[in-house]
Amino acid sequence: NEADLPFRWGHLLTGPIAIEGAMPGDVLEVRIDAVEPLADWGFNAVEPFDGTLPHDFIMSYRVLSHIGVDRASRTARLPWGTTLPLNPFFGVMGVAPPPEYGEISSREPRKHGGNLDNRRLVAGTTVFFPVWAEGALFTCGDGHGLQGDGEVCVTALEMALEGRFTFVLHKAGSVAERTLPRAESPSHLISMGFDADLDEALRIAVREMISMVCERSTLGRTEA
């Protein structure tokens, strides 16, 4: 029998994973130890009336592209023959949202993380999440074989990935307070901002970067 349930848009995710001792106000450090492809294919989809340019590509059907993946050479071959290097990462990573958010989908990124779609969050990078609920409840998924600076057509190279993570819990007061996810690679600091207004999201990300630079140096906000 078919259940009469409301449709909830969302991603394929693994979790939630409870972190022992995590409480609101703590910071969860997530070390991305490894991200590996699990399949020899992926796909990209262009949806009708969706994405960054919904009125530039007017069609009544979905354009679905099968993309072959060579795991040995870590490359993907597009249908027209272009070969690109893989850069696998999980599009969705986050913890449980603040209770006042209520029930939400995985589509919008907010201060708990979520649908970050940040191609720089690859193996070797560490992400810091503010904890909003007991146990933190880490979740990840939405595997991407590679992606540009965002999903202008709403998808990247969507594919199955396997990840390995190390979790480090920082109790409240032991590190600087966090209100947004931020990340560090071996060579870069990575700030993020989330808002329905892209200009405001940019301002938030710049303020976050200023704070990150100041915390790691003797510079003041103006110099940073």
Regions found by a protein language model. Give the residues of each.
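Intrinsically disordered, low-complexity linker/loop segments enriched in Gly/Pro
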Residues: A34-A123, F128
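Extended, compositionally biased non-globular segments
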Residues: G193-T222
